[in-house]
Amino acid sequence: MNQILKEKEQKTAKILVDRNPVPTSFEKWGVPGHFSRSLAKGPKTTTWIWNLHADVHDFDSHTSSLEDISRKIFSAHFGQLSLIFIWLSGMYFHGARFSNYTIWLSNPSLIKPSAQIVWPIVGQEILNADLGGGSQGIQITSGFFHLWRASGITNELELYVTALGGLFMAGLMAFGGWFHYHKAAPKLEWFQNVESMLNHHLAGLLGLGSLSWAGHQIHVSLPINKLLDAGVDPKTIPLPHEFILNRELMSQLYPSFEKGLWPFFSLNWGAYSDFLTFRGGLNPITGSLWMSDIAHHHLAISVLFIVAGHMYRTNWGIGHSIKEILDAHRGPLTGSGHRGLYEALTTSWHANLAINLALFGSLSIIVAHHMYAMPPYPYISIDYPTQLSLFTHHTWIGGFCIVGASAHGAIFMIRDYVPSQHYNNVLDRLIRHRDALISHLNWVCIFLGTHSFGLYIHNDTMRALGRSQDMFSDTAIQLQPIFAQWIQSLHTLAPANTAPNALATTSYVFGGEVVAVANKIAMMPMKLGTADFMVHHIHAFTIHVTLLILLKGVLFARNSRLIPDKANLGFRFPCDGPGRGGTCQVSSWDHVFLGLFWMYNCISVVIFHFSWKMQSDVWGTVSQNSLVSHVVGGNFSQSAITINGWLRDFLWAQASQVIQSYGSSISAYGLMFLAAHFIWAFSLMFLFSGRGYWQELIESIVWAHSKLKIAPTIQPRALSITQGRAVGAAHYLLGGIATTWAFFLSRAISIG
């Protein structure tokens, strides 16, 4: 009898949510700092507003309940998605209401995209450039037009409808965030059910997501793009639903549609090769990947992810258990291996976030390289300003995510790391030999720095002395990147053996022919030489220094020889109290702060290298006689081998457009260039300054106000050391990024 009762208990469905756990109270939310007892009392000094901003999203400081923290993060994700949908809706609405999309669609190789027209109020209509086809406006470089063309959007109505769909989804997400915190909040065990989460994300989001996108590409994008490529007027092309509902319409373009699903069920999948292809290379009409290749790709990865989504053990006792995998994962030199990591990852969101940010950041940088090497959207490869913008955008995103990974890794070490859980496992062993790790990494940084800059300084000296025959260059002492060249040739030759039916190489960056659209170069083989070898080692240097700072911040987050009780001081602290000299700037937060500057150095060199290399060796025109002429005539190989060359032939020569922009349609970038320099310089006031100086100044100003009986009730206080550094770093990065933005776009739009 007891056995039957037990079985019945097991069969009853688990209740995975709590009903109405937190009341919806606008009265409570109306109190600034309601999440903290001390902040809710209101401000006594100006420090209050800084603490309010520092702690408002630090859910760990609001409560110690892991369940409540998990719910807040989950709810915040819905809020984030809501904002993303509003933003996307705005992009589509601007495309529908204010853009020249349909004009651009008629001639994408000559007409420039715009989604904003400036109204003439104080003469700023000068910003409306002539974009071709009788349209005027501010040129945009987001790539949305190319994405819409690839999606099969042919008119403004479709953009309006999509914008409305985005608003509806934004509302749904906002409601979801409220509902899953206030009405039906998941229990902690739901958040910790990693196998179900993996199955859901792999099979649902990635698998079915890819499948639905493949379906859209096959039924909508392919036929519409085929007709557009053939020069059919967009106004006469049938609407998407007609292609979906009318099989005859599709079979005129792709004959295999007449056969329906029979080839699928009879395993004669080759019948579908008219719309699921494996061509390789680029479409010569659009300069982008073949749409049929892209559809095939999404169909293939959807199958892989749907299979992957059935790998983990949930209800039926079959499949993998993550805990079992981690606990069993032990090598001969790794002690107790990965034991303890499952417990860490199911109780620390910071640990999860650290891993995911590192992977996502790296992926973003990989995406940046794919966007130019394998351009996915029609005509995007000949829109040079857009290509430069997208590369820069994705590398910046990657850099910030990787620094964020270090920040949350350190927070995990301080707040969530339980030493007894990690005895002799891989993480414990990593921490125990951190001195060897950091000192060796430091040696690598010194080696890379001295040798890579040494090569440049040698070249500058030789050129200054007129001894060009003694320089490291392609025409004197060669330092050819032989491994990179070998990989290029390997990738050029491989498809003939590994994919015999492919028509071309994966990417023309490796080798092959020049692909030009409307006489503009979309992609061509990228020749690598001594200049690339040298700047590559600068990349290696800056990446390793960034890694040194960030890794040291994580590995020494809990303690060090200097401060054995660092974990008790928390994530951010200015110094280890008075009377302990030399203990400032040692908190994990300070490592993130320093890491941000090196990340900025690192990404700047990357985007400068990309911009100059593409203008010198890839971007340009092809004449009727098949003569290739590049934007800056191939000066990279001889100029990028000296520091003076970088300053004179890249920064100074290419800044001429932004400096001389006044009185033209790009004059806003000239103003932005100056304003961003100002913001950058303003940051130095915070970074080079002592707190005591400002406190002293404030007190004399307060004295003057008191004399005049106008002293404020909230006492002014100088920024703390940490706050000052945060403000300084923020303005330094904002100023630097906006300066680069103005410099790049004014240059790219002028040559584009």
Curated annotation (Swiss-Prot):
PsaA and PsaB bind P700, the primary electron donor of photosystem I (PSI), as well as the electron acceptors A0, A1 and FX. PSI is a plastocyanin/cytochrome c6-ferredoxin oxidoreductase, converting photonic excitation into a charge separation, which transfers an electron from the donor P700 chlorophyll pair to the spectroscopically characterized acceptors A0, A1, FX, FA and FB in turn. Oxidized P700 is reduced on the lumenal side of the thylakoid membrane by plastocyanin or cytochrome c6. Phylloquinone binds at residue 694. The chain crosses the membrane at residues 73-96, 159-182, 198-222, 294-312, 349-372, 388-414, 436-458, 533-551, 591-612, 666-688, 726-746. GO terms for cellular component: chloroplast thylakoid membrane; photosystem I. Gene3D superfamilies: Photosystem I PsaA/PsaB (1.20.1130.10). HAMAP family: PSI_PsaA. P700 is a chlorophyll a/chlorophyll a' dimer, A0 is one or more chlorophyll a, A1 is one or both phylloquinones and FX is a shared 4Fe-4S iron-sulfur center. It holds the Pfam family PsaA_PsaB. The PsaA/B heterodimer binds the P700 chlorophyll special pair and subsequent electron acceptors. PSI consists of a core antenna complex that captures photons, and an electron transfer chain that converts photonic excitation into a charge separation. The eukaryotic PSI reaction center is composed of at least 11 subunits. InterPro entries: PSI_PsaA, PSI_PsaA/B, PSI_PsaA/B_CS, PSI_PsaA/B_sf. Belongs to the PsaA/PsaB family. It is a multi-pass membrane protein. Its EC number is 1.97.1.12. It catalyses: reduced [plastocyanin] + hnu + oxidized [2Fe-2S]-[ferredoxin] = oxidized [plastocyanin] + reduced [2Fe-2S]-[ferredoxin]. [4Fe-4S] cluster binds at residues 575, 584. GO terms for molecular function: 4 iron, 4 sulfur cluster binding; chlorophyll binding; electron transfer activity; magnesium ion binding; oxidoreductase activity. It is found in: Plastid, Chloroplast thylakoid membrane. Keywords: 4Fe-4S, Chlorophyll, Chloroplast, Chromophore, Electron transport, Iron, Iron-sulfur, Magnesium, Membrane, Metal-binding, Oxidoreductase, Photosynthesis, Photosystem I, Plastid, Thylakoid, Transmembrane, Transmembrane helix, Transport. Chlorophyll a binds at residues 685, 693. It comes from Cyanidium caldarium (Red alga). One of its GO terms (biological process) is photosynthesis. Chlorophyll a' binds at residue 677. This is Photosystem I P700 chlorophyll a apoprotein A1.
